């Protein structure tokens, strides 16, 4: 439809033409680079993630709630096995419509992030917490853009009982990332690696996350962030858009990393994609709600440059990936 036809249609019937949400962001140029003094979470760092409880993550968020009460809010969604599942919302300042009779209001660009649904993947929670810390303390133009224009809704530790015991499953022995519909897999072997529980949504953690998703059906993206035991970072992909996003992000970051770290091999992408099967996972549930979901996996220890699980060089690289992925999403959906 041409612009003239759109205008004619609007004036003939002003309620008939619907134009999709538009977002006007001023985007910086280049690639975001994490600070060189990013703190690691290895056994040799001040914070050893595999020996910590979920509180080490919550402390970072709680500090932000105290420092920025007009922007950061906290909600205790529930308590499981004596441990809280917290939710934090990072809001920007919305423009006010001074006309009381108007129904035109600002629509936020919202991104949801869920981390550590597998308890022994503490690095995802740590990296995401550092992102939000830098989001409010950095004058980097990319951070300023995200801070001003994006609303983030976050569950930092989706499996606190597994986190504090450095194990994959929760205290019921259930893999929370296999406890969803659709495509739930029934199993009579509770000791199996990916045992998803006796039935879909049998676990309170799952029920709370489902409620979280239901309350965020206006989100532009749900990021399901995990850690893998080895290899370069990867995205599990569900469609062509995911592949194109991964190509763009890894192409830019590979150049950056290869320049900064001569240990990396040259002339190749330092990341890859994998197609995801349907296994009753969180991503399956989110996609069933018509939302765009990305599953991102970053390594416990970055090949070539990492020496210990969750050490500083690893965390710096995966923070690069997290932030530049969010930037790419905003840039291509605005």
Give the predicted meaning of each segment.
Residues 107-110, 122-255, 259, 263, ...:
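Active-site/substrate-binding loop(s) of hydrolase catalytic cores
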Residues 67-77, 259-267, 271:
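Short secondary-structure junctions
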Residues 74, 87, 154, 222, ...:
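Conserved beta-strand scaffold positions in the cores of enzyme catalytic domains, especially
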Residues 87-107:
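Short beta-strand-to-loop junctions in surface cap/lid or active-site-entrance loops
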Residues 231-242, 271-334:
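Active-site-adjacent mobile loop/cap segments within catalytic or ligand-binding domains
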Residues 3-10, 14-86:
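Short glycine- and acidic-rich boundary segments immediately preceding or forming the N-terminal edge
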Residues 112-115:
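Short hydrophobic beta-strand that contains or immediately precedes a catalytic carboxylate
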């Amino acid at each position: 439809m041409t612009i003239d036809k759109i205008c004619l249609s609007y004036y003939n019937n002003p309620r008939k033409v619907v134009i999709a949400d538009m977002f006007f962001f001023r985007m910086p140029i280049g690639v975001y680079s994490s600070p060189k003094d990013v703190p690691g979470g290895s056994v040799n760092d001040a914070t050893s993630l595999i020996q910590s409880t979920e509180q080490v993550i919550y402390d970072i968020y709680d500090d932000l709630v105290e420092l920025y009460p007009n922007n950061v809010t906290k909600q205790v969604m529930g308590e499981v096995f004596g441990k809280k599942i917290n939710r934090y919302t990072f809001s920007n300042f919305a423009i006010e419509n001074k006309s009381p009779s108007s129904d035109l209001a600002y629509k936020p660009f919202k991104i949801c992030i869920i981390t550590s649904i597998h308890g022994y993947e503490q690095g995802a929670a740590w990296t995401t917490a550092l992102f939000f810390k830098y989001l409010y303390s950095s004058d980097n133009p990319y951070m300023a853009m995200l801070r001003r224009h994006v609303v983030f809704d976050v569950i930092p530790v989706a499996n606190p009982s597994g986190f504090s015991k450095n194990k994959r499953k929760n205290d019921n022995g259930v893999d929370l990332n296999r406890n969803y519909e659709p495509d739930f897999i029934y199993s009579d072997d509770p000791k199996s690696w990916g045992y998803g529980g006796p039935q879909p949504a049998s676990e309170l953690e799952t029920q709370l996350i489902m409620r979280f998703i239901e309350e965020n059906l206006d989100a532009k993206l749900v990021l399901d962030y995990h850690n893998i035991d080895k290899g370069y970072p990867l995205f599990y992909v569900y469609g062509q858009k995911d592949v194109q996003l991964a190509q763009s992000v890894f192409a830019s970051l590979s150049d950056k990393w290869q320049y900064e770290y001569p240990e990396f091999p040259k002339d190749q992408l330092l990341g890859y994609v994998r197609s995801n099967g349907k296994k009753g996972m969180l991503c399956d549930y989110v996609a069933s709600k018509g939302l765009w979901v990305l599953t991102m996996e970053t390594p416990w220890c970055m090949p070539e440059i990492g020496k210990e699980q969750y050490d500083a060089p690893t965390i710096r690289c995966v923070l690069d990936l997290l932030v530049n992925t969010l930037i790419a999403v905003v840039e291509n959906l605005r």
